[in-house]
Amino acid sequence: MESLTLQPIARVDGTINLPGSKSVSNRALLLAALAHGKTVLTNLLDSDDVRHMLNALAALGVSYTLSADRTRCEIIGNGGPLHAEGALELFLGNAGTAMRPLAAALCLGSNDIVLTGEPRMKERPIGHLVDALRLGGAKITYLEQENYPPLRLQGGFTGGNVEVDGSVSSQFLTALLMTAPLAPEDTVIRIKGDLVSKPYIDITLNLMKTFGVEIENQHYQQFVVKGGQSYQSPGTYLVEGDASSASYFLAAAAIKGGTVKVTGIGRNSMQGDIRFADVLEKMGATICWGDDYISCTRGELNAIDMDMNHIPDAAMTIATAALFAKGTTTLRNIYNWRVKETDRLFAMATELRKVGAEVEEGHDYIRITPPEKLNFAEIATYNDHRMAMCFSLVALSDTAVTILDPKCTAKTFPDYFEQLARISQPG
C-alpha cells in the first residue's frame, strides 16, 4: 500500500485558497441539471464525489462542458425531472452526496434505474430515505440487503404526506427537499427524531432559493413544499470554499502558527462547518473573520467538552487537535460519525491510541487525553479522506507520522498534502 511520511513541522504560516465545497458542488450540479436554462458553476470542486455526480448526470443525458481544470462547469438544464432511455445502472462510488439526492430525484416520473457503488456504500444506510419516498408513491426495490444500496428505482413519487427520520443523516431530508418541488402534488415532510447536522439543511434551502424555489420551514420539524414548481438557473453561481477542508489548516495554525488564512469562506458563509473556528477560539486560538476569509493564530490550547452535532465533519479535526490541548477533551453527540465513509468513531479511537493518547470510545462520544509525547505511528485511513487529513496534524509535534493510502483525500481534496507542505516549515 502507498504511504506518505510527514516529517515534524516546526511552524505553519500562509494563505490557502480553498477548493470548492463538496456539499455545495454536488447540490448545485443536481439543481442546475433539473433547472430551466444554462448554469455556469465556478470554483466547482474537482474530486471523486463530484466526478461520480457528473458521470451520473451525463448517463442521464444532461449536457455539460468542463474547463481543463474541471472547476468551471456549464450545464444545460433539463427543465424538469431527469429521465433515462430504457434501463440504466449508475455507479456512484462511495459518494453519499450523489447517492442520496439522486435516489430521490430519479423517483420522479417513470424510470427504471439501478443505483450502486463501492462495498462501503452498500454498508451506508438509506432505509429512512426509501421509507419516506415510498410514502410519497415511489416504487423502490432493495437489490441486496434491506435498507442499504444497491437500489432499483421505478419512479412513482407524487408528493403527499411523508415523514423521514432525521437522526442518522441530514442527507435524507436534503434529498426529499430538492425533489419535492418537482412532484405533481404538494409535499409535507415531517421529521421524526432529532434532526442531525441542521446546518447542512440550511445549505440545501439556500441553494434551492438561489435556483428560484422557496419552501416553508416550520422550525425544522416540518417542511411544506408546493408541487408543480420548476427550478430556474441563476446564470452564474460561485461555489463557496469547503469549510470542512478549512478546518485542517486553521487547526494547524492553532497548534503551530504563525497565522494561516483560508480564503473562499467567511463570516457570511452558508456552511455550518465555519463554526469550527469558534471551537478553536474556545480552546485558546485567535480567530479573525472577514467576508471572504477566516484566519487563525496560535494560542495555548486547552481541552473542551462540547456537543458537536452541528459540525460532525469538522469535529473530527478537533479530535486530533486535542492531542495538543491541555487536559481531557470530550466530543459529544457524534453518533453519525459511525455511518460516514467508515465508522469514524472506531477509526478515530483506534488511531489516536497508536500515537499514545488515552481514548474512551462511547456509543456517541469520544474522550481524548493526550500523552506527554506523541509516538511515531503508521496511520490506517480506512479509505476515508478525513482520517488522512486529520492525522496529518500529528506532524505538528516533534514526531513524524506515516499516513497509509494518502491518495484517499481525492474524495474532497486531491492536493491536500501539497497545500499543507506549502505553508509548513520543517522542524
Swiss-Prot record:
Principal subcellular localisation of the protein: cytoplasm
Gene3D superfamilies assigned: Enolpyruvate transferase domain
Pathway: Metabolic intermediate biosynthesis; chorismate biosynthesis; chorismate from D-erythrose 4-phosphate and phosphoenolpyruvate: step 6/7
Cited CDD domains: EPT-like
Residues binding phosphoenolpyruvate: 22, 96, 124, 171, 344, 386, 411
Localization: Cytoplasm
Binding site for 3-phosphoshikimate: 22-23, 27, 169-171, 197, 313, 336, 340
KW Cytoplasm (keyword) present: yes
A molecular-function term among this protein's GO annotations: 3-phosphoshikimate 1-carboxyvinyltransferase activity
Record's keyword terms, sorted: Amino-acid biosynthesis, Aromatic amino acid biosynthesis, Cytoplasm, Transferase
Top-rank taxon, per record: Bacteria
Reaction catalyzed: 3-phosphoshikimate + phosphoenolpyruvate = 5-O-(1-carboxyvinyl)-3-phosphoshikimate + phosphate
UniProt GO BP: amino acid biosynthetic process; aromatic amino acid family biosynthetic process; chorismate biosynthetic process
Active site per the UniProt annotation: 313 (proton acceptor)
EC number: 2.5.1.19
Pfam families linked to this entry: EPSP_synthase
Subunit architecture: Monomer.
Similarity-based family: Belongs to the EPSP synthase family.
NCBIfam families cross-referenced by the UniProt entry: aroA (TIGR01356)
Name of the featured protein: 3-phosphoshikimate 1-carboxyvinyltransferase
Organism of this sequence: Escherichia coli O17:K52:H18 (strain UMN026 / ExPEC)
The gene coding this protein: aroA
